From Swiss-Prot:
This is Potassium channel toxin alpha-KTx 1.13. GO terms for molecular function: ion channel inhibitor activity; potassium channel regulator activity; toxin activity. GO terms for cellular component: extracellular region. Potent selective inhibitor of high conductance (maxi-K), different medium and small conductance calcium-activated potassium channels (KCa1.1/KCNMA1 and others), as well as a voltage-dependent potassium channel (Kv1.3/KCNA3>Kv1.2/KCNA2>Kv1.6/KCNA3>>Shaker/Sh). It blocks channel activity by a simple bimolecular inhibition process. PROSITE patterns: SCORP_SHORT_TOXIN. Belongs to the short scorpion toxin superfamily. Potassium channel inhibitor family. Alpha-KTx 01 subfamily.
């Protein structure tokens, strides 16, 4: 799943993904957070 959350490191996305998609797996791609379920 793609998000509109900007990021610089994948670590920033973990809590975002947990909130949005209830998954703790996320990566920073092209300066945006991307979540995996």
């Amino acid at each position: 799943q793609f998000t509109n959350v900007s990021c610089t490191t994948s670590k920033e996305c973990w809590s975002v993904c947990e909130k949005l998609y209830n998954t703790s797996r996320g990566k920073c791609m092209n300066k945006k957070c991307r979540c995996y379920s």
